[in-house]
A protein has these predicted regions:
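Interfacial helix-loop-helix junctions of multi-pass membrane proteins
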Residues: 262-263, 308, 340-365
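Intramembrane catalytic core of multi-pass membrane enzymes that act on lipidic substrates
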Residues: 125-213
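Juxtamembrane "helix-exit" motif on the non-cytosolic side of transmembrane helices
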Residues: 42-55, 82-83, 106-115, 136
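Alpha-helical transmembrane segments
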Residues: 26-42, 95-106, 151-155
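Membrane-interface loop-to-helix entry segments
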Residues: 205-220, 304-325, 353, 357
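Membrane-interfacial catalytic/cofactor-binding modules of polytopic membrane enzymes
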Residues: 254-327
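Interfacial segments of alpha-helical transmembrane regions
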Residues: 144-153, 222-259, 263-272
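Membrane-interfacial alpha-helical segments at the cytosolic side of multi-pass membrane proteins
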Residues: 224-228, 314-331, 361-372
Length: 383
C-alpha cells in the first residue's frame, strides 16, 4: 500500500524554484552594483568625465573601519552571546592570571602609543585574535566574512562614483522643499536652528559623544557583516550587503530625480556654529568637493556622499537591526545606540528630520524586497 500523500509537502520542483528565487534575491545587490557601474561608465564617457578613483584612500579608510568593526563585533558578541563568548574567555583569564598581566601590559603600551579610542580598538582586536587562537577556530571559518566584505567594498565604490557623477551633471537643488516640510514637523523651526541652539548650549562632552555616535555607524555595519557571516554563514552576510546596496539604489534613483543636500549646504551662518571641529571640517570638505564637482574639476572620486533625502545614515542601522534581531540583547543595545544616532544626525546638522523619515521608508522597502523569499537560518557556534 502506498503511503498517503501530504498535500502541503513541498515538491522537488517547488523546492528548486524556491532555491532559484532565493539565489536571485541573495545576489540582487550584486546585480544592482554591476548595473550601476555599467551606467556609471557609459554616463561618464558620454559626458567626457574621467573615471578616476582614489583607490588608496578607499582602501585605507575601509581597512580602518574594518579594524573598528572587529572591536565593535566583539563588544556586541560579548553582550549578546555571553555564554559562548564572554564566559569562556573570563574562565581562561581566571585560570591563567599571567595572561591577564600580559594583556594589561599590551594595553598600557597601546594607550601610551595611541589616542584612547584607537588604543581601546587595538586592545579589543588583540583580545579577539587571542580568543580565535585559543579556541582553535578554523582559518576557513574566519574567511567567511571576506567575500561579503569585498562585495560591500565594490558596491560602495560604485555608489560613491555614481553620486559624484550625478552631482557633476545635475546642479538642481530641491532642498527648500524638504526644509519646508521640516518647518511643519518642527513647528516653524529648522534643522539648522535646532542644531545651532543645541551645540551652543550643550557641553562639549555631549556633542563629542554625538559625533562619535554618528561616525561609529560604519563600524556598526561592519560588525553586523562579521556577526551574520560568522554565526549564520557567508550567504547571510551576502544577503545583508545586498540589502544595504538595494537601499543605496533606491536612494540614488531618488537623488537623480530629486536632488537634495544637507541643511549645512544652505546654512548662512554655518561657519559660526559651535559644532565639533571634526564635524565642521568634514562638512566644509564636502561642500568644497561639491563645488569642484559642479565646476567639472578633474579630481578623483573619493568617499564623498551628498544625498540628503532619503537619509541612509538611518536606513542602514535599521537594516542592521533587522539582521541582528535574533540576538535580543544585541538588539536592545543597538536600539539605544541608534536612538542616540538619530538625534546626532539632526543635532549635528547632517540631515533634515524629513530625511530620516525617508530613510525609514527606504530601509523597509529594501528589507522586504531582499528578505521576503529567504527562510531564516539558525545561528551556529563558531568553529
Amino acid at each position: 500500500m502506498l503511503p498517503p500523500v501530504d498535500a502541503h509537502a513541498p515538491t522537488k520542483s517547488s523546492t528548486d524554484a524556491t532555491s532559484r528565487v532565493s539565489r536571485i534575491s541573495r545576489y540582487r545587490g550584486l546585480t544592482i552594483a554591476a548595473g550601476l557601474f555599467v551606467v556609471l561608465l557609459l554616463g561618464m564617457r558620454i559626458h567626457g568625465i574621467p573615471l578616476k578613483f582614489s583607490v588608496s584612500n578607499f582602501l585605507e579608510r575601509y581597512a580602518v573601519v574594518g579594524i573598528q568593526s572587529i572591536a565593535y563585533s566583539l563588544i556586541l558578541g560579548a553582550i549578546g552571546m555571553p555564554t559562548e563568548i564572554f564566559v569562556p574567555m573570563k574562565e581562561r583569564y581566571r585560570e591563567s592570571p599571567l595572561r591577564l598581566v600580559i594583556l594589561g601590559l599590551l594595553g598600557a603600551l597601546f594607550f601610551y602609543l595611541y589616542p584612547p579610542f584607537a588604543a581601546a580598538v587595538f586592545l579589543l582586536v588583540s583580545i579577539g585574535i587571542l580568543e580565535a587562537y585559543d579556541r582553535g577556530i578554523a582559518a576557513l571559518t574566519l574567511t567567511r566574512p571576506l567575500l561579503p566584505a569585498i562585495y560591500l567594498f565594490v558596491g560602495l565604490i560604485t555608489v560613491f562614483g555614481f553620486n559624484a557623477y550625478l552631482v557633476t551633471i545635475r546642479t538642481a537643488n530641491y532642498s527648500s522643499i524638504v526644509a519646508t516640510l521640516d518647518s511643519y514637523l518642527l513647528f516653524g523651526h529648522s534643522a539648522s536652528e535646532l542644531s545651532h541652539r543645541f551645540c551652543a548650549s550643550a557641553p562639549d562632552t555631549i556633542t563629542t559623544a554625538l559625533m562619535i555616535s554618528y561616525f561609529a555607524l560604519f563600524a556598526q555595519i561592519g560588525a553586523c557583516l562579521l556577526i551574520t557571516s560568522l554565526k549564520v554563514g557567508r550567504e547571510e552576510g551576502i544577503k545583508f550587503v545586498s540589502t544595504i546596496l538595494f537601499a543605496y539604489l533606491i536612494t540614488m534613483l531618488i537623488f537623480a530625480a530629486f536632488p537634495t543636500f544637507s541643511p549645512y549646504f544652505t546654512c548662512a551662518d554655518h561657519q559660526q556654529a559651535k559644532l565639533p571641529q571634526v564635524v565642521l571640517e568634514a562638512q566644509q570638505g564636502l561642500m568644497q568637493q561639491l563645488r569642484l564637482r559642479q565646476h567639472h574639476a578633474n579630481i578623483p572620486i573619493d568617499t564623498e556622499y551628498y544625498v540628503a533625502f532619503p537619509c541612509m545614515h538611518i536606513a542602514q542601522p535599521l537594516i542592521v537591526l533587522w539582521f541582528l534581531r535574533r540576538w535580543r540583547r544585541i538588539l536592545a543595545v543597538l536600539i539605544v545606540v541608534d536612538t542616540i544616532l538619530a538625534a546626532a544626525i539632526v543635532l549635528l546638522e547632517w540631515h533634515y528630520v524629513t530625511d530620516l523619515l525617508g530613510g525609514v521608508a527606504v530601509a523597509g522597502i529594501a528589507i522586504v524586497v531582499n528578505t521576503n523569499f529567504s527562510r531564516e537560518t539558525e545561528p551556529s557556534s563558531i568553529h
